[in-house]
Amino acid sequence: MKKKTTLSEEDQALFRQLMAGTRKIKQDTIVHRPQRKKISEVPVKRLIPEQADASHYFSDEFQPLLNTEGPVKYVRPDVSHFEAKKLRRGDYSPELFLDLHGLTQLQAKQELGALIAACRREHVFCACVMHGHGKHILKQQTPLWLAQHPHVMAFHQAPKEYGGDAALLVLIEVEEWLPPELP
């Protein structure tokens, strides 16, 4: 089947005349980001120290100064406050979800540590932590723990579609991805 052209023969001839001597551009300057590998099993020998390192930062004695009015939010001093606004509006969609329902405080700390380690390992920028309502123990402690971790850039009460006031959206600092060097 022949392609239909809307140009007249005269216009086509003029176009060919103007394009004489040109060559096709070869696309070789953009290095595409490789697709994320499927999550593979991480050796247990590596997982346990990773979780211990990540949960090491969570202390029950230290009480960071968080704003108690309005929705729960935190922005690390070196991060723009606009990031919290983006979290509030739902501009970031979480790729990993952690449900803390039914866990003890110790288990919740370990799981938070594992979540942060997994985010950094898998280069996941945004995660959702669902602490629930319950007896308000985890609801109160989770923001305090997250504010202590150096890899947590910001967090904000989640929008309704991700759990509302029973969840937090968390921005995790991941290493910069560098494209492979060209030969």
UniProtKB/Swiss-Prot annotation:
GO MF annotation list: RNA endonuclease activity; rRNA binding
Q: Which species is listed as the source?
A: Shigella sonnei (strain Ss046)
SUPFAM superfamilies for the chain: SMR domain-like
Task: Tell me a GO biological process for this protein.
Answer: rescue of stalled ribosome
Gene name as annotated: smrB
Q: Write down the Gene3D superfamilies for this protein, in alphabetical order.
A: 3.30.1370.110
PROSITE patterns from the UniProt entry: SMR
Its annotated function is as follows: Acts as a ribosome collision sensor. Detects stalled/collided disomes (pairs of ribosomes where the leading ribosome is stalled and a second ribosome has collided with it) and endonucleolytically cleaves mRNA at the 5' boundary of the stalled ribosome. Stalled/collided disomes form a new interface (primarily via the 30S subunits) that binds SmrB. Cleaved mRNA becomes available for tmRNA ligation, leading to ribosomal subunit dissociation and rescue of stalled ribosomes.
Top-level EC class as recorded in UniProt = hydrolase
The keyword Nucleotide-binding appears for this protein:
no
PANTHER family membership: DNA ENDONUCLEASE SMRA-RELATED, UPF0115 PROTEIN YFCN
Report the protein name in the record. Ribosome rescue factor SmrB
E.C. code = 3.1.-.-
Recite the UniProt keywords alphabetically. Answer: Endonuclease, Hydrolase, Nuclease, RNA-binding, rRNA-binding
**Pfam families for this protein:** Smr
Smr domain boundaries:
98-173
User: What family is it from?
Assistant: Belongs to the SmrB family.
Check the record and name the HAMAP family matching this protein. SmrB
Listed under subunit, the entry gives: Associates with collided ribosomes, but not with correctly translating polysomes.
